[in-house]
Structure formats: structure tokens, C-alpha cells
Amino acid sequence: MERDHAVVEADLTTWNRNLYGAVHGGMFLTMADCAAGGAARSNGMRYVTISNSFEFFRNTKRDHLIAEGRVKSRGTTLCVVEVEIRDETEKLLCGGTFTMFCVGKQDCVPEK
């Protein structure tokens, strides 16, 4: 992970696939949310997802996925991250935009 950028990779199993043997949509969204969160928090602050818009272009039966998140805009409280997910042949499978809300510094512990 570097400033304003994060990469999440996953090797797929039968648990990540649908009945047709292709990747389950929830797997794509989970990876995308992790990549968006990683890119957002690369500035040392903690973020939560408040919204996303996601598009599925094609599916795959390959065994490895790479999600890449890049910050497009960062303000005091909001961070907008674009995410793309590709397979190991670098074919674009899906992507989206995530809006993240800053909830504080990474090292803080919530008070009761």
C-alpha cells in the first residue's frame, strides 16, 4: 500500500464461486470495499464506506483476482476512491466508485 493507492489480491476457491463456477458477485464487492478502504486510510486516518456504485462487466472462472483502489478526491471528511478488479490476465472484470467517511485517526480507540 502506498499513499492514495491500495491493492488487494485473492486466490479463489469453490466458496467464492456461484453455482456456475464463476466468481460470486459478493466476492467482487468485498474485494472492492477492502481496496477502497485501504486507499482511503493510506493517509493515516480511519474510514468507513458510506456509499458505492459498482458495475459488473464480465465474470471469470480463473483462480486469481486483483483489486486496485485509487483515491480520486480527498477532503476533510470524505474520500472518493475508484476501484477496478482484474483477473491474472489483466482482463477488467468490474469496477466502481466508493465514497468513504473519515471517522478519526487510525490509532484512536473508541470510548465507551
Language-model segments: what does each one mean?
Residues 60-62, 66-68, 72-112:
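HotDog/MaoC-like acyl-thioester-processing domains
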Residues 20-41, 49:
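Compact, glycine-rich, soluble single-domain proteins
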Residues 37-66, 71:
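Hydrophobic beta-strand-centered segment that forms part of the acyl-chain substrate-binding groove
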Residues 17, 21-22, 33, 65, ...:
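Short glycine- and Lys/Arg-enriched binding-loop motifs that mark or flank ligand-binding interfaces
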Residues 1-21:
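Catalytic strand-loop segment that frames the active site of acyl-thioester-processing enzymes
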